[in-house]
Every structure is written in C-alpha cells, then in structure tokens.
C-alpha cells in the first residue's frame, strides 16, 4: 500500500452536516477499497488565490491515508462529481520522510516580564548641545 495525502476545498457556506457528509463519503471510499484511513484535519475557511465558481473563500480539508491506485481513481472521481467540492489534489507521499510534529513550547510569563522590564529600565542617552 502507498501513502497518500489529499487536500480538498469545499464551498465556504456549507453547514457542518454537509461537511460531515462529504468527509464520510471520502472515508467510505477508503474503507471500501481496504485502505487505511489515518487522519482528517479541518483547516478552516481561507481566502482563495483566485475565485472558483464565484467563491472567494473555501473550507480546506486535509486527508492522510494508505491505499492503492484503484482507490485513488475512485476517490478523485467522486470528488470531481460532488458539486460541494471546489478543488482537490492527491499526492503520493510514500517516499517522503515523516516529519515529526513539533509543538511550540510556551515562553514562561516571568521570562517575558523580565525582558520587557529590562527594555523599559534601560536609560536612554541624552544628547546635549
């Protein structure tokens, strides 16, 4: 099995139920072709680079899964036929190295306060004429 990523853009005015219906259809295709569904992320509504079907914004969804070529063909066919989907793209990531998820460490509040206090406490040079 190969690893794939698919990003698809939905119309921005869809209800949560409509978004769930589209996501369920995609997951059904993956499971019916004995694929391994790994992750679905909703990236939210973002501005498009150019209008698509008179929509300036779109809801981005990211999907990661394992499967075969037949599954990709069927998945893309169903996305193409769905009027709620503005655009989609699938990418084979089998040979791509796994990137570890890096979480940002919160800066302690005390350290920020000390840095800002030092900046305020530093006297300014005076210029005399």
From Swiss-Prot:
InterPro entries linked: Ribosomal_bS6, Ribosomal_bS6_sf, Ribosomal_S6_plastid/chlpt, Transl_elong_EF1B/ribsomal_bS6
Keyword Zinc set for record: no
Gene Ontology cellular component annotations, sorted alphabetically: cytosolic small ribosomal subunit
UniProt-listed GO biological process terms: translation
Keywords carried by this UniProt record: Ribonucleoprotein, Ribosomal protein, RNA-binding, rRNA-binding
Family the UniProt entry places it in: Belongs to the bacterial ribosomal protein bS6 family.
Protein function: Binds together with bS18 to 16S ribosomal RNA.
Name assigned to this protein: Small ribosomal subunit protein bS6
Gene source species: Pelobacter propionicus (strain DSM 2379 / NBRC 103807 / OttBd1)
Gene (name only): rpsF
